[in-house]
Amino acid sequence: MKRVFLLIATNLAILLVASIVMSILGVNTSTMGGLLVFAAIFGFGGSFISLAISKWMAKKTMGCEVIVQPRDETERWLVDTVTRQAKQAGINMPEVAIYQSPEMNAFATGPSKNNALVAVSTGLLYGMTRDEIEGVLAHEVSHVANGDMVTLTLIQGVVNTFVIFAARVVAGIIDNFVSSNDEEGQGLGMFAYMGVVFVLDMLFGILASIIVAYFSRIREFKADEGAARLAGKDKMIAALERLRAGPESGAMPAQMSAFGINGKRSMADFMMSHPPLEKRIAALKNS
């Protein structure tokens, strides 16, 4: 409920500030409410649809094979470990799956903390010790228990709304300026206006990605802390040390990558969904 109130308050604040700025700049604000509704529908619509089908998409895109009946001792241990950690975290048992990939990675997804999926790669399952795997599983279970999927969906919805809303407001200001300085008062024209909106969508979209990445990194530190409580600090540190010693993670769909144990490196830390492994290890050692 707190997230919903935060969501409403954030969008109302966006509308209020935009309306004040538009009034100062002399832009007609009579359609601001309609524009915000339009932006929110599209901004949140895509995010919530993506969240609703996240488990289905993960299974299809990653080729996840859900363990219904363990076929061997390794799968039995995997299911038992997640079962124990889920009980410790106070959530319903997530589905447990394995996907074929040589790289060591894992992810959690799902529309809610009581309707989730935890998946591990074959590279991780057979390339790590059980203590290290236990640390990884605890990290993913912590993502689920913390409600990170819903939290980041709300954040993504807010920034999507901002991008759609702000791009069209700024384009309107530009159109108004051009119109006021044009003898014919025609403004930008439809195609030029659409071009300006497109460019602004891209620019604001980059800013939005930085904001989402910032919150994602915070959630990663929180998931590491949760993993230390569920499995023990030493196991979580050992898992991160093993990941640091291994090759960089390859491509993974963005929604799964955001909740993976290990993210891809970027040209700049502020664009990364995951903090550098060195910082995560240091944070655990100093906690």
UniProtKB/Swiss-Prot annotation:
Cellular compartments annotated: Cell inner membrane
- Which major enzyme category is it? hydrolase
Cystine pairs:
none
- Write down how the cofactor binds this protein: Binds 1 zinc ion per subunit.
Which keywords accompany this UniProt record?
Cell inner membrane, Cell membrane, Hydrolase, Membrane, Metal-binding, Metalloprotease, Protease, Transmembrane, Transmembrane helix, Zinc
Q: What family name appears in the similarity comment?
A: Belongs to the peptidase M48B family.
Question: What is the recorded name of this protein?
Answer: Protease HtpX
Which species?
Shewanella denitrificans (strain OS217 / ATCC BAA-1090 / DSM 15013)
The upper taxonomy is: Bacteria, Pseudomonadati, Pseudomonadota, Gammaproteobacteria, Alteromonadales
